[in-house]
């Protein structure tokens, strides 16, 4: 780690968004509050702490802020892989504002959010063209990405192992019509993976998300040109794999981009902040706005534009059913979020943190 002044050209090689000092007022304010601190990026996140770097070649274990160790501290306010922090020696002294992120409602009874990755330009939603192929799961990922500021790109792997690649692409035509890029690749073939180059330019950051066994680690190895990430075989009966990646990590690529690999996620719960129109359902939302009744359930109501589109073969009924399910989940999560915010506000007024606020998420 540098102990003198920021080396901005080197920081750019791990995703620093400016040619020199920060240009956003919110970042400038944090820098001003810590004049002796230097910027670094969180490149690994473990249950026991963080690893940060200010160059592509070197990283160090970092001592986190004391408040992050408190059991009730909101998990989404802790650093995540991709975050920029200010360091004094090996100690994190401040978390810089996030420019973009992808997050989910974390598993568990109590409401809390979990940041999957921060300050990312592109989210590669990876799904295998085998028994793992699931358009509904892809739609769920698109919902979580929508509104977070990053560009979603659907990557269908194992294009060399199936005769159904064209059928899968046909199923996803509705998403492509909404300008959501789709690419089918052989994750082991560098020439095939080259289709992802437009999103992996110098200084850009991308994150790979998808279920275990989808081919994320294989894709990472191909992009790196080396077998850095461990890969496991998938079960033939259901195409599911064991978790190859056990923690989130940011990896510099030869192209000059940074790639964040993530473990497979079983639960993809909304946070309540999602926008269905931005999350892959803009066409359904536009039709819903044309329904005769504002509270139309799109089942059998007269004047339902959504049902009319289904009957005309213009919308996939399974996709609409998933839209309805996700809409209910977002509404339910939004209610829980509103309740938590109200509890937080009451807690601030009394000088105490309420008992029901964020619990630590899984790192």
UniProtKB/Swiss-Prot annotation:
The role this protein plays is: One of several proteins that assist in the late maturation steps of the functional core of the 30S ribosomal subunit. Helps release RbfA from mature subunits. May play a role in the assembly of ribosomal proteins into the subunit. Circularly permuted GTPase that catalyzes slow GTP hydrolysis, GTPase activity is stimulated by the 30S ribosomal subunit.
Q: Which cofactor does it need?
A: Zn(2+)
Q: Where is this region: Disordered?
A: 340-363
Q: What EC numbers are recorded for this enzyme? A: 3.6.1.-
Q: What family does the entry list?
A: Belongs to the TRAFAC class YlqF/YawG GTPase family. RsgA subfamily.
Descriptive protein name: Small ribosomal subunit biogenesis GTPase RsgA
What's the subunit arrangement here?
Monomer. Associates with 30S ribosomal subunit, binds 16S rRNA.
Q: How is the cofactor bound?
A: Binds 1 zinc ion per subunit.
Subcellular location per the Swiss-Prot or TrEMBL entry: Cytoplasm
GO BP term, pick one: ribosomal small subunit biogenesis
An example Pfam family from this entry, by short name, is RsgA_GTPase
Enumerate the UniProt keywords alphabetically.
Cytoplasm, GTP-binding, Hydrolase, Metal-binding, Nucleotide-binding, Ribosome biogenesis, RNA-binding, rRNA-binding, Zinc
Question: Matching InterPro entries, A to Z?
Answer: G_CP_dom, P-loop_NTPase, Ribosome_biogen_GTPase_RsgA, RsgA_GTPase_dom
Cellular component GO terms held in the UniProt record: cytoplasm
Protein source organism: Xanthomonas axonopodis pv. citri (strain 306)
GO molecular-function annotation terms?
Answer: GTP binding; GTPase activity; metal ion binding; rRNA binding
Binding site residues for Zn(2+)? 291, 296, 298, 304
Tell me where it mainly resides.
Answer: cytoplasm
Domain CP-type G positions: 112-268
Q: Where does GTP bind?
A: 157-160, 210-218
């Amino acid at each position: 780690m540098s102990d003198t002044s920021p080396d901005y050209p080197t920081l750019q090689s791990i995703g620093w968004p400016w040619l020199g000092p920060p240009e956003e007022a919110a970042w400038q304010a944090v820098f001003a509050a810590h004049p002796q601190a230097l910027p670094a990026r969180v490149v690994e996140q473990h249950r026991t702490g963080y690893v940060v770097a200010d160059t592509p070649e070197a990283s160090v274990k970092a001592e986190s802020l004391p408040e992050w160790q408190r059991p009730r501290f909101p998990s989404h306010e802790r650093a995540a892989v991709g975050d920029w922090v200010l360091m004094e020696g090996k100690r994190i002294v401040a978390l810089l504002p996030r420019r973009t992120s992808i997050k989910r409602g974390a598993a568990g009874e109590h409401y809390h959010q979990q940041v999957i990755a921060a300050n990312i330009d592109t989210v590669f939603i990876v799904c295998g063209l085998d028994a793992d192929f699931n358009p509904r799961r892809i739609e769920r990922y698109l919902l979580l990405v929508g509104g977070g500021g990053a560009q979603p790109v659907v990557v269908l792997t194992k294009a060399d192992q199936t005769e159904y690649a064209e059928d899968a692409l046909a199923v996803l035509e509705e998403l492509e019509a909404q300008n959501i890029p789709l690419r089918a690749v052989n994750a082991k073939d560098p020439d095939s993976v080259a289709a992802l180059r437009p999103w992996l330019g110098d200084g850009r950051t991308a994150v790979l998300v998808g279920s275990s066994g989808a081919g994320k680690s294989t894709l990472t190895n191909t992009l790196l040109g080396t077998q850095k990430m461990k890969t496991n075989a998938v079960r033939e009966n259901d195409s599911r794999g064991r978790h190859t990646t056990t923690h989130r990590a940011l990896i510099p690529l030869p192209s000059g981009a940074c790639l964040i690999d993530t473990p497979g996620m079983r639960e993809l719960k909304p946070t309540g902040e999602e926008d269905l129109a931005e999350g892959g359902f803009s066409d359904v939302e536009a039709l819903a706005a044309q329904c005769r009744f504002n509270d139309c359930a799109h089942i059998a109501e007269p004047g339902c534009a959504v049902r009319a589109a289904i009957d005309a073969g213009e919308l996939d009924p399974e996709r609409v059913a998933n839209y309805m399910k996700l809409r209910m989940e977002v509404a339910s999560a939004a209610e829980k979020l509103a309740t938590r915010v109200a509890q937080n506000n009451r807690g601030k007024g009394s000088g105490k943190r309420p008992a029901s606020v964020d619990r630590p998420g899984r790192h």
